[in-house]
């Protein structure tokens, strides 16, 4: 890709700008531009799309997104050390890359973007799950984004696509599968990164559905699954008792045995419970 965009290899960029990854920022840099291009392609045809990227670091994925035709990339970067490297990419792609220095958890990107919008990111490990839950649980749906193409630790990716009954099934699976079509599209070994993490990574592609699979208030559903899976080995009548004094009756009304555990309950039943809880007098 260096020959295409006229920019130097990422190892050279990192050395020149002293961009050693910081553990406290959850950084692991992907240096193979062939892999970053592959991740960009996993997001689909980016022509005519605005793209949000969180934690671009030295800009490997940023370059992939721009080379694959993204109309405009909004890169949100907390680490000030990366800004000069990203500015060089912006110069190579005039008018197509906007960099915001700040925390993605505190920034509203919508003022900077024009639909259609996609989110593509090698998320910092320490904020990835929190960002995903925010993107999955807005009050209004469809959301501002068409799709999410996100890299996580492989264990987290497997939790997003997990089915009831297994150890991986939990809050992420329920929230993701309620409103999106989610699938793992790539796995990457530790040695693909600098520094190499201790675990494999995976890219998950989530496409927003036109509407949720079953009706439920997102805040209530999030509260139900958070409580249920926070104490996943407990029976639901115990793990959810803090949500409502008549939780056993609400479970039965939703078709759920009060003695069941969260990992045994499917999406439809969780949504039924959330509806019942929202409608129940306190």
UniProtKB/Swiss-Prot annotation:
Q: Which reaction does it catalyse?
A: adenosine(1518)/adenosine(1519) in 16S rRNA + 4 S-adenosyl-L-methionine = N(6)-dimethyladenosine(1518)/N(6)-dimethyladenosine(1519) in 16S rRNA + 4 S-adenosyl-L-homocysteine + 4 H(+)
Transferase as a keyword of this entry, yes or no, is: yes
Q: Which gene encodes it?
A: rsmA
Similarity-based family: Belongs to the class I-like SAM-binding methyltransferase superfamily. rRNA adenine N(6)-methyltransferase family. RsmA subfamily.
Of the GO CC terms on this record, one is: cytosol
Originating organism: Paracoccus denitrificans (strain Pd 1222)
PANTHER family hit by this protein: DIMETHYLADENOSINE TRANSFERASE, DIMETHYLADENOSINE TRANSFERASE-RELATED
Question: EC number(s) of the enzyme?
Answer: 2.1.1.182
* Annotated residues for binding of S-adenosyl-L-methionine: 28, 30, 55, 77, 103, 122
Where in the cell? Cytoplasm
A GO term for molecular function: RNA binding
Protein name in the entry: Ribosomal RNA small subunit methyltransferase A
Which keywords has UniProt assigned to this entry? Cytoplasm, Methyltransferase, RNA-binding, rRNA processing, S-adenosyl-L-methionine, Transferase
Which InterPro entries does this one have? KsgA/Erm (IPR001737), rRNA_Ade_diMease-like_C (IPR023165), rRNA_Ade_Mease_Trfase_CS (IPR020596), rRNA_Ade_methylase_Trfase_N (IPR020598), rRNA_adenine_dimethylase (IPR011530), SAM-dependent_MTases_sf (IPR029063)
